[in-house]
């Protein structure tokens, strides 16, 4: 039987993956975002697939959008999951809590990731992986940056107090969460924060603070069996604390033009 993809948007994935708990409850803001943006996958889902929404209240908006744009997807509500036999879940991200949620909705175990897969995913999502990869991404003089994975209290203290300013990060976090901005003093608050994060996630990511001029990301797609392809750029904004504020919706050509004001196009294209 041909599987039908069921897309779902779970913006709490980073937080849930960091927790690792099957009963993890996201904060109210994340739950509200997931509910209000439940139909977001309709904009990137493959033709003929379905999008999971909390209830049929989302259907009116989807129908309105389909009158104006080509969005060849259908809505599936949570109560309907158990009655549709050929669904294959395609979430924003996998984590133990989502696996439990889908199982409770009636998704067959064969369509859910095994525990070793989730453990490997958590390991690969850990920022210590980026620390190891960063030096290999610096292809020419246009690139810079350093990042450290520190596991001992004396390392945290030494790093903070040896710089006028620096940034400490929880290894499993996203969207500007799990950040601690330091001003050269290893205070009791910072020490306590580091100890709590390291107890849960193994250590702390420590980085210098740079004179940033623009936030952008390169987006890639992995098919899960070894093939990775570049799918586009993302230019976004953050607030003074580093938390995500929003995105600019621009074609890749325009983003490349803007980035070229700071870095030669040949450099980031080669990356």
Language model features: what each stretch is:
Residues 1-43:
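N-terminal-proximal low-complexity accessory segments that begin disordered
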Residues 220-271:
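ATP-dependent carboxylate/phosphate-activation module, predominantly the ATP-grasp catalytic core
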Residues 190-242:
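Phosphate-binding site of ATP-dependent enzymes
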Residues 30-44, 51-158:
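Conserved N-proximal alpha/beta basic substrate-recognition cap immediately N-terminal to
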Residues 146-147, 166-190, 217, 239-256:
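Glycine-rich phosphate-binding loop of ATP-grasp-fold ATP-dependent ligases
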Residues 30-39, 127-132, 187-193, 259-271:
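Well-ordered, non-membrane alpha-helical segments in soluble/globular domains
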Residues 140-145, 167, 183-211, 270:
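Conserved ATP-binding module of the ATP-grasp superfamily
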Residues 134, 159-181, 200-212:
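ATP-grasp fold ATP-binding core
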